[in-house]
UniProtKB/Swiss-Prot annotation:
It is found in: Cytoplasm. One of its GO terms (cellular component) is ribosome. It comes from Tetrahymena thermophila. GO terms for biological process: translation. GO terms for molecular function: structural constituent of ribosome. This is Large ribosomal subunit protein eL20. Coiled coil: none annotated. It comes from the Eukaryota. Pfam families: Ribosomal_L18A (PF01775). The keyword Ribosomal protein applies. Keywords: Cytoplasm, Ribonucleoprotein, Ribosomal protein. Belongs to the eukaryotic ribosomal protein eL20 family.
């Protein structure tokens, strides 16, 4: 049985369910009595198993530590405090294409960092055919309005931004006028 996270949205959107974990591990001691250094890393993954796998992949690349040379101490999920305001996130990443490794910087608007990362994964899959396993997130940041670079997010920078109502939905003024079955077809134009 799969356990649901507290921040998982209630509606079934098309976004990939991405969670943020802090994985802590220690190198196995070579000699008796020595204290091994503790290594920590923030990882975006679907679940704890994928988080551990991504952690060991990065440790092999960065610190030259294999899974057999260390042990995982803890895997903790990070929950964001406020999901009420839309923020702009800047994400630095690298991904493996069929020919080479590419570095990228992308900006997304979302209420949570997990949502921005899931947008990133879908965007990379659609535009670059990159699988989620080939994407390595290097750095994330919440951007101030003056730090926004990309035109798609620059258009949303205005605080007094308004959207036109393209389609009006006629609703009954009071609850007593609301019915389950109508005698005529509704007009939606």
């Amino acid at each position: 049985m799969v356990r649901k996270a507290a921040q998982e949205p209630k509606d079934d959107t098309l976004q990939m369910k991405v969670r943020q974990y802090v994985v802590s591990a220690a190198r196995l001691p070579i000699e008796q009595g020595t204290k091994p250094e503790i290594l920590q890393m923030r990882v975006f993954a679907r679940d704890e198993v994928h988080a551990k796998t991504k952690f060991w992949y990065n440790m092999r690349k960065l610190n030259k530590i294999k899974r057999s040379q260390g042990r995982i101490l803890s895997v903790n999920e990070i929950y964001e405090k406020s999901l009420n305001t839309v923020k702009t996130y800047g994400i630095v990443l690298k991904y493996q294409s069929r020919t080479a490794i590419h570095n990228m910087y992308k900006e997304y608007r979302d209420v949570s960092l997990n949502g921005a990362v899931s947008q990133l994964i879908q965007d990379m899959a659609g535009n670059h055919r990159a699988q989620p396993d080939t994407i390595q997130i290097i750095r994330t940041a919440t951007l101030e309005p003056k730090d926004i670079k990309r035109p798609a997010t620059l258009a949303m920078r205005n605080a007094a931004l308004k959207f036109p109502i393209v389609k009006t939905i006629h609703r009954p003024s009071e609850k007593k006028y609301r019915t389950v079955y109508k005698a005529t077809r509704p007009t939606t134009f």
